[in-house]
């Protein structure tokens, strides 16, 4: 999935601003409090519209803190019609979608986001209803500064069987870090390999690679929490 352009209207500190992303890699540079995080939040919500078409992942909506406010002296007045409008493509289809929070305290509508939602629903049905194994799903990763050191130390248990959709998209756009899910998967497949069972993905590599991984986890202190 690719977002080529996004318009932010009454969104955080943007009254009405558009951004284009013409290349495969975009770097945003600016002084503090100039809107870099606001832009990332808008992109996060735009990408999160895809999740509305899936059965299990959490939904993302425009929140009251996303609504632009104007200083009128004694108070800040929230502005109406806070929205993001995005243009992009997924699986070679050009898409345009928009979500709006008409007023503070209302709900984020999705009536203009159906092109992306319906495409997501189709992919979801292929995975969960038709049980197809070769479905090209988009990859989402969101990393904000809030992810740094936001998790306390905790024990990592073996990963039990679950949903491919839920596992893949459960916390993909969460503002907090989640290393537990991936490490559960690594640990479960590592134990499968030790028992001679079939494993998934990159865990099918050599035993030496897995030993190096465990050694590194122990060196960083995470190995003790894996046990």
Task: List the model feature ranges, each with a label.
Residues 1-187, 198-205, 222:
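P-loop NTPase switch/coupling surface
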Residues 223-227:
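Long, charged, glycine-rich C-terminal linkers/tails
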Residues 209-221:
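Zn2+-dependent metallopeptidase catalytic core
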